[in-house]
């Protein structure tokens, strides 16, 4: 969405938080850390990966940091889609998926939601395409149970299923516990929404 230059607005359309980050975040940004700003940061983000791996119960090499989850998603589309390999996604979801497909000349397979705005998992079975599912789907406020995502993974063993969990902390089941069981699963999370760090531009892509 549009970014006002005066920053006097709280952008509800992108869910900017009116609250400060956790006191633990403020405490972590000590004078010692501020002094490090004159130096280039670790290009592999080893400390971040170690902390994230401990939090999510994964190995550091299963996590890729990004400049916000948008970058993680963009890279995923670059890696798993092209003019011969479409991206399948719902007709009512984040607009960025269609924008990126247009920029990268990726064919879009747009799948309609049901009349009640829920997603029918069977519409995604056996597509032989890369799939991205926002879960929860913020534009509709509806989330799929983890078991239904698992059904989509089983039905597409040779194709990547990307689960965009930008709003998972607001409700819904994370698919992170499925990562070690499915090589075709990529889970993407952001620190910009419930974690109140939009200005830090930090996202994580997690997979097997």
Predicted regions and their residues:
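Hydrophobic/aromatic beta-strand patches that form the interior of the parallel beta-sheet core
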Residues: 10, 88, 109-111, 162, ...
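PLP-dependent aminotransferase-like
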Residues: 79-134
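Short glycine-rich anion-binding loops that position phosphate/pyrophosphate groups of nucleotides
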Residues: 15-18, 69-70, 94, 135-139, ...
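Active-site pre-lysine segment of PLP-dependent enzymes
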Residues: 118-127, 139-161, 165-197
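Short, well-ordered alpha-helices that flank and scaffold nucleotide-derived cofactor binding pockets
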Residues: 27, 31, 54, 78, ...
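Short beta-strand-to-turn element immediately C-terminal to the catalytic PLP-Schiff-base lysine
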Residues: 203-208
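N-terminal "arm"/small-domain region of PLP-dependent enzymes with the aminotransferase-like
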Residues: 1-39, 51, 126-127
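Phosphate-binding glycine-rich loop
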Residues: 37, 47-86, 104
